[in-house]
UniProtKB/Swiss-Prot annotation:
One of its GO terms (cellular component) is endoplasmic reticulum membrane. The keyword Mitochondrion does not apply. Gene3D superfamilies: FAD/NAD(P)-binding domain. One of its GO terms (molecular function) is squalene monooxygenase activity. Its EC number is 1.14.14.17. It comes from the Eukaryota. Pathway: Terpene metabolism; lanosterol biosynthesis; lanosterol from farnesyl diphosphate: step 2/3. The record marks Y91 as: Important for enzyme activity. InterPro entries: FAD/NAD-bd_sf, Squalene_epoxidase, Squalene_monox. One of its GO terms (biological process) is ergosterol biosynthetic process. It is found in: Microsome membrane; Endoplasmic reticulum membrane. This is Squalene monooxygenase. The lineage of its organism: Eukaryota, Fungi, Dikarya, Ascomycota, Saccharomycotina.
Length: 497
């Protein structure tokens, strides 16, 4: 079978003579949500994806409660159903073998997820029962829930929901370039379509959602490029015995980099091992054996060793990218193409989906042919999204700096953070709300972060001799300075970019 005939016909026959209301570039997590939402708002949408078959990736597998709430607002939450997904009810942190656990926030402490008109109907904002997901647990439990899943299965569900919309046309093809007119305004995309060659498709608005390795974020800014400071090595553990069921796990220690573990199906657990450099060690299996395996909790050791023996692993760079302002007529960049954070906290999908919710509320009811008015609203969108994006993004890099502590004072902060979280629910309520993505307050995040820093200073005085007490005073100033150094620049960048 030739390449030209190997794709379903319906993915190749988009009409280039039509001027679409919107072209969506990319059908990852964010793209289908944008396309579905706009179609339900009455827009004629073309969504272009290079490969519609199910991907095999280790990104986007743990969704925080804020992401689930956003899916409810979009009427797409049933994308987590029938994919052997696993609910998550909180986090467990293990520090040098000592364990603390905390649950996600109470629903009563939050406003209900917003039901966006035209998007939510016929109960599509409710989770349903399947083999691994309990509707009662999600809908009636007093606390919020997150969910872990195999990324590709979730993605195919999102794409299926998108494909069911009459106003959505799907196209298989490789977007070569973003089209502009003589005034440098974006007017569509040039797509290399199998069997048709290079075809120009026109639209009033073009939404770039092409993910981590975006080719087209440069259409907004050629200088705002992503930075990579560290990497994750991912392994699949089968029939693993997690220390706390239905929890995400962060495994910390004074002698090793962070390790993240969470269940993604009834039989599979993902484990991500941090490597504090952008390029991986030459011998990854040897590094895993020597630098990671000794610190794996006993209950996970058997499945981890089996994964090591298979020598099957995947690697991912941990990228950082502040958002550029959407200031080009006819163009909107959204998702990881716009903004990236460290994946340690699992907040990426939450930010992207909350951005889609805000985007639809901002421009969903507008006439996209009035492009300058849409652009004016997108300028407001840039600032309004900062509340949730700033918290999740800044928290991700600040926590990674603490959890991957590679200096004396960062280790002091790491120990203080763990002990702070262990003081009980009253102390952990706001931190877990930040981690869940449901407390979009940069002010409160700053307050809590420096409260943790001050607590680290306080416990550093314990058991000191008189001479040691004087040293602790000096170290206290150094701890606060270190905290400011790892937190303030990123907060500043997020708020003022």
């Amino acid at each position: 079978m030739s390449k030209e005939t190997s794709y379903p016909k319906e993915l190749l026959c988009a009409d280039e003579k039509v001027v679409y209301d919107a072209i969506v570039v990319g059908a990852g997590v964010v793209g289908p949500c944008v396309a579905t939402a706009l179609a339900r708002k009455g827009k004629k949408v073309l969504i272009v994806e290079r490969e519609w078959s199910q991907p095999d990736r280790i990104v986007g597998e743990l969704m925080q409660p804020a992401g689930v709430r956003a899916l409810r607002s979009l009427g797409m939450v049933q994308a987590i159903n029938n994919i052997d997904a696993c609910s998550t009810s909180g986090y467990t942190v293990i520090y040098n073998g000592e364990k603390i656990s905390f649950a996600y926030p109470y629903k009563a402490d939050l406003s209900p997820p917003e039901k966006i008109p035209d998007l939510v109907f016929d109960g599509n904002d409710k989770v349903v029962d399947d083999g691994t997901i309990s509707a009662k647990e999600f809908e009636e439990d007093e606390r919020e829930h997150g969910v872990g899943f195999v990324h590709g299965r979730f993605l195919q569900n999102l794409r299926a929901i998108c494909a069911a919309e009459d106003r959505v046309t799907r196209l298989q093809g490789n977007v070569i370039s973003i089209l502009r007119n003589d005034s440098k305004e974006v007017i569509g995309a040039k797509v290399d379509v199998p069997g048709r060659g290079k075809v120009d498709f026109k639209a009033h608005m073009t939404f770039v959602c092409d993910g981590i390795f975006s080719r087209f974020r440069k259409e907004l800014s050629t200088t705002n490029t992503s930075k990579v400071w560290s990497s994750f090595v991912g392994l699949s553990l089968h029939h693993a015995d997690l220390p706390t069921k239905h929890h995400g796990h962060v495994i910390l220690g004074s002698e090793h980099m962070p390790v993240i573990a969470y269940q993604i199906s009834s039989t599979e657990t993902r484990i991500l091992c941090a490597y504090n450099y952008p390029t991986l060690p030459k011998n990854v299996p040897e590094w895993l054996q020597k630098e990671v395996q000794p610190f794996i909790p006993p209950s996970l050791r058997k499945s981890f060793d089996a994964a090591l023996e298979s020598k099957s692993y995947k690697c991912m760079p941990n990228s950082w990218l502040p958002a550029s302002q959407n200031n080009v007529t006819g163009l909107c960049v959204v998702g990881d193409a716009l903004n990236m954070r460290h994946p340690l906290t699992g907040g990426g999908m939450a930010v992207g989906l909350m951005d889609v919710v805000l985007l639809v509320k901002t421009i969903g009811d507008m006439d996209f042919s009035d492009r300058e008015e849409v652009l004016n609203e997108l300028l407001g969108f840039h600032y309004e999204r900062k509340a949730h994006a700033c918290v999740i993004n800044t928290l991700s890099i600040a926590l990674y700096s603490l959890f991957a502590a590679d200096s004396y004072y960062l280790k002091k902060l790491q120990k203080g953070c763990f002990e702070y979280l262990g003081r009980g629910e009253d102390w952990v309520r706001q931190p877990i709300s930040f981690l869940s993505g449901v407390l979009p307050s940069p002010y409160l995040l700053t307050k809590v972060f420096f409260t943790v820093a001050l607590y680290s200073v306080l416990i550093n005085f314990r058991g000191r001799t008189p001479l040691g007490f004087l040293l602790a005073i000096y170290e206290g100033f150094a701890i606060i300075f270190t905290a400011a150094k790892v937190f303030t620049p990123f907060l500043y960048e997020q708020l003022l970019q």
